[in-house]
Amino acid sequence: MTTTMSTLPVVLVDEILARVPITSLRSLRSTCKKWEASSKTNLVGGKATARKSSHVGFILIGDKICSMKLDLNGGDDFVDTSVNQVSAFDGFAISQLFHCDGLLFCISNNHYSNYTLMVCNMYLGETRLIQNRSLFESYQNFCSYAFGYDSSKNRNHKILRNNSVSGGYEIYSLKSDSWKDLNVDLEKSIHLWRLGSVSLKGNAYFRVIKVIEEGVWEYNLLCFDFTRESFGKLLSLPFESLGDEGEGIMVISCVRDDHLAVLYQRDTLGIWISTEIEPNKVSWREFLQVDLATLDGFPDVFIAGRFIVDEEKQVVVVFGQETELDLNHGNAFIFGRDGYFTSFTVGDAPPEDFTSYVPSLVSLQIDKTGKRKARDD
């Protein structure tokens, strides 16, 4: 009896699918109906992401997007990485990455194009180029962005950005394919951090700085609710950040789209994970504290950037930011309990950005009535 792809055991198909790069999924889906159905169950339904020590995402090296798979195996061979440049983004120089609900939102640093924003579903092979309101506004990559969705049945995905022309905020709806101004504002003492917002359960969370007095400020967290299209209250952080400008590094990340994590680097490097989080309320638990000065062989100059929390292995993966005295090249560091740390290389230079990624069936197509097609899940 001849074995064909359609007659392979389900267990073997699932194992094959778990090893397929994100960017190859579209070609694989056309192999046979069984494989397409299995890919939806395996990748979208959660079998692949249920492997808690396997982390899939996209990393920005220079202005090029690369897919990355990171397996934390334990033992001597603790880290297994796979980094591959994504050819689909050739010619679209990227400056920022965002992920929400299986969609990847990219911002180009091509200031002379009227299309500097792109949303794509790598699993479905769909892409949406978003037109700016005017050519001048293509400079919006210097502004703060956020990506999320409202609580409607079919999840209308939206993009928030501050408007450098008017000084206010505007929002783009993927469903209507249009921009509109928002009647929202923040206190003059509150400033959104331009980079690094994350999406969690449809809402966006920003790092913000609140100015206490001249030269003195503190970090806070701020949620933008895409259903209400408004900001929430300032959310407290689990550490004391009051100080002079330039003191302390704060970064936020998501833990499997279930919780928010915050990193704070000052004399030590600390990680906390939310136990409860809503637009106007948050509580925290400590995950890890690392005294960098006690780590033998750790570089003298290190500024923490994006990070990944692995609760099963009780470790955190931290990508460094590039500095004038950068000696880390493209290294990332893994920190664990009892002073454990190791490093691995992800490229020739420190990554500019990173976002985790979970495939989904969210379509970017618009039907003849001008509405987005319903979710197929």
Swiss-Prot record:
This is F-box protein At1g11810. SUPFAM superfamilies: F-box domain. Transmembrane segments: none annotated. InterPro entries: F-box-assoc_dom_typ1, F-box-assoc_interact_dom, F-box-like_dom_sf, F-box_dom, SCF_F-box_component. Residues 2-48 form the F-box domain. Pfam families: F-box, FBA_1.
